[in-house]
């Protein structure tokens, strides 16, 4: 079907070369501030024609909000969004009316429906994912405002080129930000195509090997402008936050494209600060829902969470995530956990706040104004923020408490003004007192979120529509030589992170509403982030 979700339901519609593509979101809470500007950035990251290594289909992908929003706030009614297809060329696919493309859905769609969309694959085209990204952007804003949850995905492998394992393991604990992914993954190519420049201004030859001779580096650096790109220079978005690996990926994709072929790879995804307790035993476990969502994306062929398939080489004593006291786990936090509300009243507890709630679930304490804003006040006198390691692209964004007495768990939820429950802070002495000291499980235990970051990987196969001539049979069983025309990505990976982020947001959003239906006025629990320390 074309719908996903139980409490938060998403429906998408439209074909690749039809008039438009769109989505309907049903179940979204009311009073969420929302505008086109909240959705468009993610669509821009997914948009075709971003560079020479993606499809040259030119689409503006400007989103239109048709219903469900008034005066800048959601109404709680179905929210509909639409994007018009402007660069349609169905005539390029006439030859495919009788010859199904190898690896594509032409044959199976025809077998199922006894008809298939000949132009670009119809619903099986990656164009359909535009609607998912639009829906995911909306849900992502709601989750960010109410729970501080964020989503990041990045390219970790293209063909046999992958991010170093040591860096991958570090990102599992402290993922790169979306800004890091976009900035550090940029690769510039000289007009003659012989020299590559990464985000750290390091130079590479046409094979992706870093230049070491100073004379050669000085000569080739003249090929690039200092402040503005040189005429004829090419900018490639790889969305790999390791600059040196990004260059090798760009070289690999460029080589594949020149052959008229395609190549696949893997996307790593991270859900930072997911609420604790999400997931429904036994068939709607959080990893089962994520796997279903990711495997519903076009071209996906594999999914793993935590250590995944690598866990088969470990013993239980190595793979188990042992629990540790919260004080030891809270020595350092990511920037997403920097915002905290501090109730100045001595001995503030969940029970105390609960007694003060009125029948509508609102808090009647003297901190009501702060709570209702749904914004957590930053305790800048107790925080220390570090930056990003520019050399290897590793995200070092972290916020560390200078006093252990400040370490605590936070209960976060939507505020009353935005259709949710209030926000409160719980001292360490009450509620959850332990957390996982490691995260081999990837943020879930028995299919329920543990409060730790959820990290996973998604494998994408090579694009099936390629320019190389292939010998294949038509629907009548006659052999033909087929070279697919049209505009297609030689590798979908650079445009795939927004897809993965959006599907993850739709899964977590649906599970949050399902858990809230069970919990009633009680806010969901969210743990602050820790990046590990010697004592842990």
UniProtKB/Swiss-Prot annotation:
Spell out the InterPro entries in the cross-references. Chorismate_synth, Chorismate_synth_AroC_sf, Chorismate_synthase_CS
Pathway it works in: Metabolic intermediate biosynthesis; chorismate biosynthesis; chorismate from D-erythrose 4-phosphate and phosphoenolpyruvate: step 7/7
The UniProt annotation puts the region (Disordered) at 37-59, 344-377
Q: Which keywords belong to this entry?
A: Amino-acid biosynthesis, Aromatic amino acid biosynthesis, Lyase, Oxidoreductase
Protein's UniProt name = Chorismate synthase
Residue stretches of biased makeup (Basic and acidic residues): 354-377
Q: What does this protein do?
A: Bifunctional chorismate synthase and flavin reductase. Catalyzes the conversion of 5-enolpyruvylshikimate 3-phosphate (EPSP) to form chorismate. Acts also as a flavin reductase (FR) able to generate reduced flavin mononucleotide in the presence of NADPH.
State a single Gene Ontology molecular function. Answer: chorismate synthase activity
Q: Which cofactor does it need?
A: FMNH2
Q: Which organism is it from?
A: Toxoplasma gondii
